[in-house]
């Protein structure tokens, strides 16, 4: 059975299915949304970005994080290619760990208006101190199962 593509409120501007240049900055990046075909069902979507990078705003040195984004969608889903491009736009962005993590969560929440969203940013040590940053919206819907984010506490090589 063949399905035709669904129209979205932004369908003309979707990045999916076409060549797109890497956005120069997070503000320039577009996060696309597509209709949720299961909008009447409470469930969880997880995106994991184990190789997220940004730049220290003071030294310009690269910072690395393992991001886990969980959300209970409402009417919209995040289109994953656009999310990949958005996250990649941080590669040349100077921002503190806390700001990068919370900004990503807020931006996604603003674009898709999920029932619930949380982001965990597990940053690798710089100066010997790992920084973990967590942010979420509201309360989780009752019947949604949320597994552990699966990122172990940083233990170094010991």
Curated annotation (Swiss-Prot):
Pathway the protein takes part in: tRNA modification; tRNA-queuosine biosynthesis
Pfam families the UniProt entry points to? QueF
Entry-linked SUPFAM superfamilies? Tetrahydrobiopterin biosynthesis enzymes-like
Q: What does this protein do?
A: Catalyzes the NADPH-dependent reduction of 7-cyano-7-deazaguanine (preQ0) to 7-aminomethyl-7-deazaguanine (preQ1).
Q: Which cysteines are joined by disulfide bonds?
A: none
Return the protein name: NADPH-dependent 7-cyano-7-deazaguanine reductase
Q: GO biological process annotations for this chain's record?
A: queuosine biosynthetic process; tRNA modification
Organism per entry: Rhodopseudomonas palustris (strain HaA2)
